[in-house]
């Protein structure tokens, strides 16, 4: 089974040997079929020159920090059906278009998110690594992700916590009577769209729990879907501990893209590392960091 971002697929597509949509749909080996069709009008030497010329150009770009990250971002962006840019200028022009994402006026990027937001967050990760060369964004790890999601960095729970989960959240402030109080508040708001359990948690946890849901880009990060699911019902500090554990285990369990890791480790410029929550100041610093990294990358 071939994939759009496999190495041989990228090489052959870049060499101009891209199968037609019909061939891609109907053929088991569409690129082999394409080459066989090309051999009807071209010599083997000509086909071979097309392939090795593309290979050496890609090899040159692999060793170029800017082109490695720019070309990789284009290959792995959403809705990338064919690689059109062939020259350095065309590739960098395409990157500039990826950087044109504008946060939603209603600050509801999460509910409205699509390929533009995904591509922008991917670009922010790529630019983050480029700025820290020889640190590379691992497109190899990226390709192993079966499905992507957008994670709330700091989220209201919106779910029914059991006694074990509430104890994990409250620590020494937990007791059976406190759990009963939470259950009462939760049940009163259940089915009425009132989220009274969330309001109760906000009062109990203070700054560690958001008073309102924030769907703006300053509260969103790119994460594999399975990794996102594993963070279910965790506060910010719980997510931070989980991501730190993944890193210590060399990402064998789950993988977080570098900029996402930096968010939860609070290692980006301007983030308050000692605060166990995601503040408004952190969101602003995160947005500025993304904007500066991407701005430097496309400049």
Regions found by a protein language model. Give the residues of each.
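Flexible coil/loop and intrinsically disordered segments
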Residues: 1-299
């Amino acid at each position: 089974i071939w994939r759009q971002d496999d190495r041989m697929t990228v090489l052959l597509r870049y060499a101009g040997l891209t199968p037609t949509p019909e061939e891609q749909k109907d053929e088991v080996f569409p690129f082999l079929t394409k080459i066989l069709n090309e051999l009807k009008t071209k010599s083997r030497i000509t086909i071979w020159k097309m392939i090795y010329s593309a290979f050496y150009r890609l090899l040159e770009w692999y060793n170029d920090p800017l082109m490695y990250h720019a070309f990789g971002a284009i290959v792995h962006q959403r809705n990338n059906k064919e690689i059109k840019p062939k020259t350095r200028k065309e590739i960098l022009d395409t990157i500039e278009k990826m950087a044109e994402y504008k946060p939603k006026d209603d600050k509801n990027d999460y509910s409205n998110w699509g390929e533009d937001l995904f591509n922008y967050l991917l670009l922010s990760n790529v630019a983050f690594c480029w700025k820290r060369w020889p640190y590379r964004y691992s497109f190899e790890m990226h390709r192993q992700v079966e499905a992507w999601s957008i994670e709330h960095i700091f989220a209201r729970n919106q779910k029914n916590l059991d006694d074990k989960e509430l104890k994990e959240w409250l620590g020494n402030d937990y007791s059976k009577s406190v759990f009963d109080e939470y259950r009462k508040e939760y049940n009163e708001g259940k089915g009425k769209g009132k989220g009274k359990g969330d309001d109760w948690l906000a009062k109990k946890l203070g700054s560690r729990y958001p008073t309102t849901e924030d769907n703006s880009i300053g509260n969103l990060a790119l994460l594999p879907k399975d990794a996102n699911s594993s963070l279910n019902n965790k506060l910010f500090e719980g997510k931070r501990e989980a991501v730190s554990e993944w890193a210590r285990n060399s990402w064998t369990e789950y993988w977080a893209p570098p900029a996402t890791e930096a968010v939860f480790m609070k290692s980006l410029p301007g983030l308050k590392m000692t605060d166990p929550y995601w503040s408004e100041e952190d969101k602003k610093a995160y947005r500025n960091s993304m904007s500066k990294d991407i701005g430097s990358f496309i400049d």
